[in-house]
Swiss-Prot record:
Gene3D superfamilies: 3.30.420.40. The gene is tsaD. Its EC number is 2.3.1.234. InterPro entries: ATPase_NBD (IPR043129), Gcp-like_dom (IPR000905), KAE1/TsaD (IPR017861), Peptidase_M22_CS (IPR017860), TsaD (IPR022450). Binds 1 Fe(2+) ion per subunit. It comes from the Bacteria. Substrate binds at residues 134-138, 167, 180, 276. This is tRNA N6-adenosine threonylcarbamoyltransferase. Belongs to the KAE1 / TsaD family. It is found in: Cytoplasm. Pfam families: TsaD (PF00814). Keywords: Acyltransferase, Cytoplasm, Iron, Metal-binding, Transferase, tRNA processing. Its cofactor is Fe(2+).
Length: 340
């Protein structure tokens, strides 16, 4: 088995993945959302301290799963990029300590690659090559995944990410953090869902294959300020619905542009924000229109988790892509390459 560790942001997670058949044997996770909610977003120093507390607790649960028999573990895998430096280092320190004390090889995994492999948790075979939309609080990307060693970025955000824009809109409406499920609930509760969009869809007339949410976010801010004296539940629902609709339409618009040139046969959607049901439905329709197979990460593995890191590290284990402890470092940025 491979013991995998994830600590790139505000989720502490450990998992055990069986090497021979890619089955997830154990998966434990502690979310920090309640600790960061009063700040309206993740506080790096607080996240780091909580990882220092939570990772050892999760390791104890792993020990119980193993009946304290660590001989079953053949390698340690750790997310080392991208993410918050102060949280990545917490996971890396644990991984190094385990690697040294158990005399096991160390595997460094890219967090974005891990999200791609969230599509294949509990599956020995992958469906690569495929294209992937990754939407989360930190990223809005289209990736082309040819195989484990060839995953490249073909489109990214010029400013805010998809998930981050939901957090900021929720904060404007004084509704808390994380904003994804809050704004989604507003949209679901809105009673006039067939109205024309009140907010502009970003980059509608731009030829660039990219994402941008800052203009949409600013349009929401102006609407909130205009309605400040009467920002009741119905107004918030209307704003939430129209914002979400415009944000998803932007993703669809840009992905359609990509589809017209690349014509992928398989398209995946991953990342924490991919839990949004309206987004999933919109992409079902898009993929149907282009005769493209849609694959979705299971809802429980959309947000950051060690199970996806364990699954991706199986490929590294088979290829013996191990890293000496003295060369094991972190990076706040991904080293996945962008296509020219």
């Amino acid at each position: 088995m491979i013991l995998s560790i994830e600590s790139s942001c505000d989720d502490s997670s450990l998992a055990l993945t069986r090497i021979k058949d890619a089955q997830l044997i154990a998966h434990f996770k502690i979310s920090q959302e309640k600790h960061h909610s009063s700040y309206g977003g993740v506080v790096p120093e607080l996240a780091s301290r909580l990882h220092a507390e939570n990772l050892p607790l999760l390791l104890e649960r792993i020990k119980i799963s193993l009946n304290k028999d660590f001989s079953k573990i053949k390698a340690i895998a750790i997310t080392n990029q991208p993410g918050l430096s102060v949280t990545l280092i917490e996971g890396l320190m644990m991984a190094k300590a385990l690697s040294l004390s158990l005399n096991l090889p160390l595997i460094l995994e890219d967090h974005l690659r891990g999200h791609v492999y969230s599509l294949f948790i509990n599956e020995k075979q992958t469906c690569m090559p495929l294209s992937v939309l990754l939407v989360s609080g930190g990223h809005s990307l289209i990736l082309e995944a040819r195989d484990y060693e060839n995953i490249k970025i073909v489109a990214t955000s010029l400013d805010d990410s998809f998930g981050e824009s939901f957090d900021k809109v929720s904060k404007m409406l004084d509704l808390g953090y994380p904003g994804g499920p809050i704004v989604e609930k507003l949209a679901l509760d809105y009673r006039h869902p067939n109205e024309p969009l009140m907010f502009p869809v970003p980059l509608k007339n731009s030829p660039n294959l990219a994402f941008s949410f800052s203009g949409l976010k600013n349009a929401v801010r102006l609407e909130v300020e205009k309605n400040a004296p009467n920002l009741n539940d119905e107004v918030k629902q209307k704003i939430g619905y129209h914002f979400q609709s415009a944000a998803i339409e932007h993703l669809i618009q840009q992905t359609k542009r990509y589809f017209k040139t690349k014509r992928p046969k398989i398209f995946g959607i991953v990342g924490g924000a991919s839990q949004n049901l309206a987004l999933r439905k919109a992409f079902e329709n898009l993929c149907d229109a282009f005769d493209c197979k849609l694959v979705l990460a299971p809802l429980e593995f959309c947000s950051d988790n060690a199970a996806m890191i364990g699954r991706s590290s199986l490929e590294a284990y088979q290829k013996k892509r191990f890293v000496p402890l003295e060369k094991a470092n972190i990076s706040p940025r991904t080293l996945l390459k962008s296509f020219e």
